Regions:
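N-terminal domain-onset segments
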Residues: 1-86, 90-92, 96-198
């Protein structure tokens, strides 16, 4: 009985997180403008690019161990409900959310001495300081799409008007054969900046 209870507790220890913004594709067939496409495919650290637009800050929206939702399971190539380490943050410029970043990796890959062990201890430090200073990390090409902001998540995009679609991108970082997928959704306020030049 004790062993059964322990297995049940272990299975339930990874809570289910709501699907990320990028899991809500727009019903409209849209093509990004030249400026939008430049940002959606921009290499290098997005954090550094945002710092050029004003005073940068990071707000942690959600972080911890969760069970993979269907969308995240597909992105990582794992079974649904596989334990993941999830980190959702708002990247802000002048205290306004500009980008919503959703980072996921298999939980076992974030354990001590594993490929992404330092993910659990980033705090308010952007991931970019880790990802672009390690020559052992490889990044995939970007995939991008227009997405809708569901009612339950509009608090992360207060500048939205008339339910206008948002643009999002994602890519996969590999280290020691372990994946870290980062999905970045550009919020409405980002495009309202006087000069979000890529």
């Amino acid at each position: 009985m004790t062993n059964n209870r322990a297995r049940t507790e272990q299975a339930n220890s990874a809570l289910r997180i709501p699907s990320p913004l990028i899991a809500y594709p727009s019903a409209h067939r849209l093509q990004p403008s030249a400026q939008q496409h430049a940002w959606l495919t921009r290499p290098g650290s997005l954090t550094e690019a945002l710092k050029a637009l004003g005073t940068f800050s990071l707000t942690i929206m959600c972080e911890g161990k969760f069970a993979a939702c269907p969308h995240d399971a597909v992105l990582l190539g794992v079974e649904e409900r596989t334990p993941l380490w999830v980190r959702d943050v708002a990247l802000c410029v002048n205290d306004t959310p500009y980008v919503y970043a959703h980072s996921i990796s298999p939980y076992e890959a974030t354990e001590p001495l594993a490929a992404w062990s330092t993910l659990r201890y980033r705090g308010h430090e952007p991931l970019g300081t880790l990802l672009y200073n390690d020559t052992g990390i490889q990044r995939s090409a970007f995939s991008w799409q227009a997405v809708e902001c569901p009612d339950g998540m509009q608090h992360v995009n207060p500048a939205i008007k008339n339910g206008a679609p948002l643009w999002a991108r994602h890519s996969c970082f590999m280290r020691l054969k372990q994946p870290l997928v980062i999905a970045e959704t550009f919020l409405t306020a980002f495009w309202q900046h006087p000069s979000p030049q890529c």
